[in-house]
């Protein structure tokens, strides 16, 4: 089973990825949790390039770096894990590219769709959980976690996090459009709910999916 989590930075994806991993492992399943970009030595180096605040990267360059990282992760890690009947949980997948580089940066959506297909080797998650949060709430959450004064730009944030509120508003709007186009795959969850409430909604959907595919 291939499961992905989506949402703007600060929505709580990483927390829910680990909660779901533990839940599935407790039920005797082999589970691999991965993040994008990253997950292989090359992909982790690409991650550093993408997030370093001092790097001035063009939108197309950013797109292709994300795609290169994904291609490495899919072919070296995800596909072998799925072939061994492991569950794979992803903290971001190709929907992030559509939302961030497409709606956020304004790149052509048809071009992105083709690059996504190539980089992902046409893999599509069985289910995607989109944790919905406004950029304002996400920013407040991030600075609260770091015990820092609220600011729209900060050296405490990485290059992507420092893209600004208008950028993240476009990204969020993009996620909603993607969700509307893929209602059978994408489940939208209010990220302002407590972590335990979000987890309950997620495992309810996962249990239903496992029953359906058993």
UniProtKB/Swiss-Prot annotation:
GO terms for cellular component: cytosol. Belongs to the thymidylate kinase family. SUPFAM superfamilies: P-loop containing nucleoside triphosphate hydrolases (SSF52540). This is Thymidylate kinase. It is an enzyme of class 2 (transferase). One of its GO terms (biological process) is dTDP biosynthetic process. Its EC number is 2.7.4.9. Phosphorylation of dTMP to form dTDP in both de novo and salvage pathways of dTTP synthesis. Pfam families: Thymidylate_kin.
């Amino acid at each position: 089973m291939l499961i992905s989590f989506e949402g703007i930075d600060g929505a709580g994806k990483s927390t829910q990825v680990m909660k779901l991993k533990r839940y599935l492992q407790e039920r005797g399943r082999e589970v691999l949790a991965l993040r994008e970009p990253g997950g292989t030595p090359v992909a982790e180096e690409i991650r550093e390039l993408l997030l370093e605040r001092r790097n001035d990267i063009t939108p197309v360059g950013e797109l292709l770096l994300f795609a290169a990282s994904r291609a490495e992760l899919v072919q070296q890690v995800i596909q072998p894990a799925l072939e061994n009947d492991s569950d794979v949980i992803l903290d971001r997948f190709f929907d992030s590219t559509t939302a961030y580089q497409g709606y956020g940066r304004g790149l052509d959506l048809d071009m992105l769709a083709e690059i996504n297909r190539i980089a992902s080797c046409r893999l599509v998650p069985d289910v995607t959980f989109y944790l919905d949060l406004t950029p304002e709430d996400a920013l407040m959450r991030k600075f609260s976690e770091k015990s820092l004064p609220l600011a729209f730009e900060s050296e405490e944030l990485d290059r992507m996090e420092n893209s600004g509120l208008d950028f993240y508003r476009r990204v969020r709007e993009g996620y909603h459009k993607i969700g509307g186009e893929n209602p059978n795959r994408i489940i939208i969850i209010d990220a302002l709910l407590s972590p335990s409430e979000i987890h309950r909604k997620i495992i309810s959907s996962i249990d239903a999916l496992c029953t359906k595919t058993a």
